[in-house]
């Protein structure tokens, strides 16, 4: 949408810009309450060269004009490589009215940078009427300050998404979805749809800590076929969505339970062994999903938009990393090693693919609990949870931790203190350091570990990854470096930023006659729920 104040020639008036329309959508989401159980949900994406971007940043703020705020509509920013390079180089950033630079929205990579720089010259020559100039680093600080304060906007990278897409022959990808793992093109005739499934990694880890690779391969291939069947039997009420589903047959296989299996294997989340395991598992799942889609194409035919796609040229997700490096002009810091025979698969996919996309790693925040494992790629947020069900509220302790402490004969002696300390084991010297390293929680891990895990997986994933970030720091300059590293490592998207609370509730123990404080080291604690432990009188 054109910027606020942009002239509307047909009516001799001025546009109100995109913000009021976003408010309308926000109100509609509130109206769709699903019997009061859950409000509707949607996400608005904006490129940060839009003249009204500063107002977009304020949408989720608590203060200010309520008519210019959204309470249900999530927000995300679509960032170009041109902007990131200007942040790194300390250069200015120009904001334009889309009415005067109408083609920018459809461009990406080198084509975007070239055209954007041409518009800068036109603006400086007085040939563009409405524009603003801000230091690129200043705008990046504003984005990250808003992210810290409100959790929005999520950061996504337009060029990594489009340049690495194998299905971009049908148009530019302009946005992701509510969880930032789906990257599909759409237009007025096509509403993008994707059919998702998440594999529970824990189900393929044997009791002797070896992997059942054969069973995992069979499950991936079965899931690919089941999702493809689902496309044909699903009743899609919106014609544009049905058309997109039929023309692209997009799938999104992902997985959950990473932290769960790392604990069972006694591997620290921030170790090279963990990064290599993510690399190996994601490559394996990607290989068998792509191969099975090629098999389906031979049986049932390719998806209608196959011709002209990256698949039709024999390209695979790993092949697009070099393309991103070339267009960006900056090497993408991704290790391109592989373990499987991808060359044979390159020749196979040229002949046909049943599905435009195969992989997307979702957050699985809810279904992972049903499956009894950890969500997506995320580490453990806490070792103790308060879980609410229809039968009431109860505590749940990480079963892997309990099992390990019992093996060390420490559970009975430490369980009360662990409950009082919200499950944080880092301050307990009785527990070996190697065990404490394995059971670090979200805010105790390096943020660069989150980036490394996502980067290792992203090189094999043709769509994107829902990557939550957890930070204890409130230093925006540190945020700039962390998110710049995510860009350098080739991440396509990030999701919520969780910042450790400044304050935590005081913990107490209860006796029959008195209440006394529990000594805790706040520097070694993690956020979570408050608990009390009962002493025997």
List where the protein language model places each region:
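Polar, glycine-rich mid-to-C-terminal structural blocks
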Residues: 58-59, 66-67, 71-150, 320, ...
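Function-dense linear segments that define catalytic or interfacial modules
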Residues: 1-10, 14, 18-21, 31-35, ...
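Internal maturation/activation junctions in enzymes
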Residues: 37, 219-242, 246, 268-364, ...
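Phosphate/diphosphate-binding loops
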Residues: 70, 74, 78-84, 89, ...
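Short acidic, glycine/serine/threonine-rich loops at helix termini
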Residues: 6-13, 52-61, 68, 107-108, ...
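Catalytic alpha/beta core of large soluble enzyme barrels
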Residues: 180-185, 227-232, 334-339, 347-518, ...
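Inter-helical turn/loop segments and adjacent helix faces that build the functional surface
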Residues: 32-44, 63-70, 94, 125-133, ...
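A glycine-rich phosphate-binding loop feature that marks nucleotide/adenosyl-phosphate handling sites
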Residues: 1-5, 44-53, 76-78, 99-107, ...
């Amino acid at each position: 949408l054109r910027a606020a104040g942009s002239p509307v020639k047909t009516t001799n008036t001025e546009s109100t810009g995109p913000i009021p329309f976003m408010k309308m959508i926000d109100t509609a989401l509130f109206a769709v309450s699903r019997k009061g159980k859950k409000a509707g949900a949607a996400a608005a994406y904006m490129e940060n060269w839009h003249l009204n971007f500063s107002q977009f940043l304020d949408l989720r703020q608590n203060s200010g004009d309520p008519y210019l705020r959204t309470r249900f509509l999530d927000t995300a920013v679509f960032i170009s490589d041109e902007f990131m390079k200007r942040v790194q180089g300390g250069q200015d950033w120009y904001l334009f009215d889309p009415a005067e630079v109408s083609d920018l929205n459809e461009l990406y990579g080198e084509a975007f940078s070239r055209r954007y720089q041409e518009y800068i010259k036109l603006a400086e020559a007085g040939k563009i009427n409405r524009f603003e100039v801000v230091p690129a680093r200043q705008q990046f600080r504003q984005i990250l300050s808003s992210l810290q304060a409100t959790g929005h906007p999520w950061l996504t990278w337009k060029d990594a998404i489009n340049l690495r897409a194998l299905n971009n022959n049908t148009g530019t990808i302009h946005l992701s979805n509510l969880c930032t793992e789906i990257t599909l093109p759409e237009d007025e005739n096509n509403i993008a749809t994707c059919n998702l499934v998440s594999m529970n990694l824990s189900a393929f880890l044997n009791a002797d800590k070896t992997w059942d690779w054969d069973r995992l391969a069979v499950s991936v291939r079965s899931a690919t076929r089941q999702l493809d069947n689902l496309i044909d039997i699903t009743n899609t009420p919106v014609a544009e969505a049905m058309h997109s589903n039929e023309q692209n047959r997009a799938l999104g296989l992902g997985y959950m339970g990473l932290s769960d299996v790392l604990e069972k294997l006694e591997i620290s989340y921030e170790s090279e062994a963990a990064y290599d395991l993510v690399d190996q598992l994601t490559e394996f799942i990607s290989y068998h999903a792509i191969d099975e889609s090629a098999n389906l194409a031979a049986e049932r035919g390719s998806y209608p938009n196959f011709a002209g796609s990256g698949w039709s040229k024999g390209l695979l997700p790993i092949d697009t990393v070099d393309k991103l490096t070339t267009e960006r002009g900056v090497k993408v810091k991704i290790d391109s090693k592989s373990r499987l025979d991808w060359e044979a698969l390159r020749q196979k996919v040229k002949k046909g693919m049943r599905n435009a996309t195969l992989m997307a790693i979702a957050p699985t925040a809810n279904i992972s609990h049903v499956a009894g494992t950890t969500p997506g790629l995320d580490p453990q947020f806490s070792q103790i949870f308060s879980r609410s069900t229809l039968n009431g509220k109860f505590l749940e302790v990480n079963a892997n931790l309990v099992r390990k402490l019992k093996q060390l004969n420490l559970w009975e002696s430490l369980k009360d203190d662990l409950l009082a300390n919200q499950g944080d084991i880092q301050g307990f010297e009785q527990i070996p350091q190697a065990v404490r390293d394995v059971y670090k929680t979200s805010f105790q891990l390096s943020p660069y570990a989150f980036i490394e895990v996502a980067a290792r997986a992203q090189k094999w994933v043709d769509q994107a990854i829902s990557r939550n970030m957890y930070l204890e720091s409130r230093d925006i300059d540190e945020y700039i470096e962390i998110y710049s590293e995510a860009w350098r490592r080739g991440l396509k998207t990030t999701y919520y930023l969780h910042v450790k609370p400044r304050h935590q509730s005081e913990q107490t123990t209860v006796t029959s006659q008195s209440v006394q404080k529990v000594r805790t080291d706040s520097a070694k604690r993690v956020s979570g729920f408050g608990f009390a432990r009962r002493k025997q009188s």
